[in-house]
Amino acid sequence: MLYNSRRVITLARKLRVVDYFALGWGTMVGVGWLVVMDDWLLRGGVLGAILGFAIGGALLLPIGYVYGQLVAAMPDAAGEIAYTARVFSRAISFATGWMMILAYFIVCPWEAVAVGKIAGYIFPALDSIELYRIAGQPVYLPHLLIGLGLTGLLTVLNYSGIRLSATFQNWTAFGTLALFALFVGFGVSKGSPRNFSPLFTHSPFVSVFLVMQIVPYFMTGFESVVKGAEEATPEFRIRGFFKAIWMAIVVGILFYAVVIAAVGYVAPWKQLTHEKFMTAVVFERAVGSRWIVRVILTTAILSLFKVFNGNFVAASRLLFAIGRRGLVDQRLGHVHPRNQTPSLAVLCIGLATAACMFLGDAILVPVSEVGSVASAIGWLAACAAYYRIGPPRHKRFIAMVGVIVGLLMILMKIVPGIPGHFSAYEWLALGMWVVIGLSLRLTA
């Protein structure tokens, strides 16, 4: 909130349960099911990938429970920053918040780049006017312009008011679900169970494990619900936060399981893992028509819009919160007097997204791996804070389960020798983010 000589200026209170679900689920499920389906299946096979997402997602339910309890007690946009500040030092509180900002923010330029790639797939003429190459990958002017245009649109929406942003999120989230049901329902009528083979690409344990490693990245978002906690309507019932968080996780698990099963069912997936946008290709092969590809790509674009917007909302609220608490420059805690939005934080996220777009997907894709660890750090810290607060014994047990899950998800990515562990690029990206955070903290 912001004080002036006449009144207290707070964030606008206009969000309902359906808005929080659209935010949580919409922030979680992006376009990975189209862009990197080949990677998921090569990691685990059809059954390995389904089990990886199902088990990994189920392990997030205790963490979702803890978030539901914390936001009910502390409906603060600071989220993990506020929770850890209750029981830990300001340094730990800031470090946790800074990691969570990375988890949300890194998705924004990734999605901005992805929309250009999808547009280029639909209209090949857009794969032209190469500006430069990074790590051997071209950066095209039309792709940049499309991504910058979308970034500008979402910046304006979020600057202008949370109700505009929430309406956009609802339409894109439920539109994604409707089109998803359409293409899956039609496509599977043409498939065969014989196409599932092989069920695992490695041993069953390794297959499931390799997929579970990436679950934190592809299921980050349910906790974005708490970042909008201060913007609930005055009549909002506090239990609505818990419902939205759990619904987001459960629907997310079902979405990933269904789309993986559908891709494995409709065509012999093993023969098509080299194809760009494999999900669209397998459905086109099964149906024998391009119309289903257009439906899938439209679904992906809507999904991209919602996950971009959801992460934009969450990142800007956290940046606003650390500014309001004086952990970085306090000007970031400014609330627009008319729009009642964290306007300066919104502008910073928009500008940073636009700048990072110029790195291209060659840099952004490996850097995005850091987001999964950043998310797990936030989950671990939130559960540890809840445990330290001292709830009843059974709730402390759930919190400890959340701590263990968060810790294991971190270790799966950073311990050398474990398949899929951090490369030098990921460590470099994480180190740079830490340096930026320390610089902002020391100059606050």
Name each model feature, range by range:
Residues 3-11, 50, 126-144, 170-297:
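Helix-loop-helix junctions that connect adjacent transmembrane segments
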Residues 33-40, 157-163, 192, 328, ...:
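Transmembrane helix-loop junctions in multi-pass membrane proteins
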Residues 39-42, 51-52, 61-151, 156-159, ...:
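Hydrophobic transmembrane alpha-helices that form the core helical bundles
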Residues 142-190, 202-205, 245, 249, ...:
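Membrane-interface loop-to-helix entry segments
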